[in-house]
Amino acid sequence: MLLQNSENGNVFDITSVVSDIQITTEIEGQAGKLTFFTLKDDVLKISSGSRLQVKWGDKGIFFGYVFNTQTDKKGNIKVTAYDQLRYLKNTDFYINKGETLAQTFEKECTKFNLQYKIEEDSQYVVPPKLFDGKSIYDILKYSVEANLRGKKKYYIIYDDYGTIKLNNIENLRTGYVIGDYSMATDYRYSKSIDKDTYNQILLFTESKDDSGRIISNQQIAKDSDNQKRWGVLQLAKKVNEKATQQEITDFAKNLLSLYNRERETLTINAIAIPNDNDVWDIRAGAGIFIDISSALGDIGTTQTTDKEGKKAIKREMYIISRCTHALKNENYHTLRLDIIKETMTPQEKAGG
């Protein structure tokens, strides 16, 4: 771990004087975070804004800046650093005149001198919108959600060792299988229809005619079978009065496909395989396979039959919404993963 002091530019290798390293990434709205402990040193000074670089072998795993230091009576010092995504909390005035996500991303990164790279762009032009005093993250989130609704593609913004990248989340899939016989040591799993589950979508518009009367147009999409199982769970949303009937109908169907399901949550504790540098590809936004047998049924696998009538196992891809790598020492590396199904991402909850 290298530290470059923000006040005098001096560079120190602090690998031998730090402990309890944790690196956390989240899929939505949070910067990558590095925390560690060290002791007071007369030579080493950790100032706010100091740059930190962390490598595992030849692989760069964190590049960021010190934002917080704290100490206690015993002289223990806790340091918290964030990657470049922290600067997406900056607020801005921005007029989106109708442009692609990549165009907005490039403009905002350039304005705030952030290193960036566009890995993939959908070329989808989002509707115009004015942002007054909104965070850069919210400005970009608007375009991310518009792409999800308009193109059915989920784009993610993440920091890759000092470069903020825009990418299709499908490109972050890994081949890792985590479960009963691979890495996992404990888990917590739940299924629920109590939150963010709807089997009936009501969309409506409101406008006034020449006499001032309010005219309302409604469109309903529903799943009658699931209503028999769960009762009626309705979500009502007002949409733009300029939307066409076909747009409203399509929007209602899209929302029903997103919300008409049980919500599954899964948290896994795991141990990394020693000397596996690729394990750092397991981060928020990455896709992994799950293979767990639980009291509520198998997680991540389903029994199927192929064309020849033979039984087969189908694996489902899951997305990591939050990931923490914890390093006690070089030989003890653990992970804590919060998992969501690939078919339901946080941005899908945005709706209109």
Q: Language-model features: where?
A:
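Conserved "cap/hinge" positions at secondary-structure junctions
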Residues: 56, 168, 292-294
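Soluble periplasmic/extracytoplasmic beta-strand elements of cell-envelope proteins
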Residues: 65-67, 78-82, 165, 200-204, ...
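An acidic/polar, Gly/Ser/Thr-rich interaction patch typically located in mid-to-C-terminal regions
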Residues: 17-44, 185-352
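Short polybasic amphipathic segments
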Residues: 1-9, 163-164, 200-206, 288
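Amphipathic, non-transmembrane alpha-helical segments in extracytoplasmic/periplasmic proteins
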Residues: 34-36, 66, 81, 93-117, ...
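A short, compositionally biased
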Residues: 1, 45-50, 149-151, 159-160, ...
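Assembly/oligomerization scaffold segments
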Residues: 1-91, 177-190
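Short beta-strand-centered interaction patches in the first periplasmic/extracellular domains
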Residues: 76-77, 83-84, 120-196
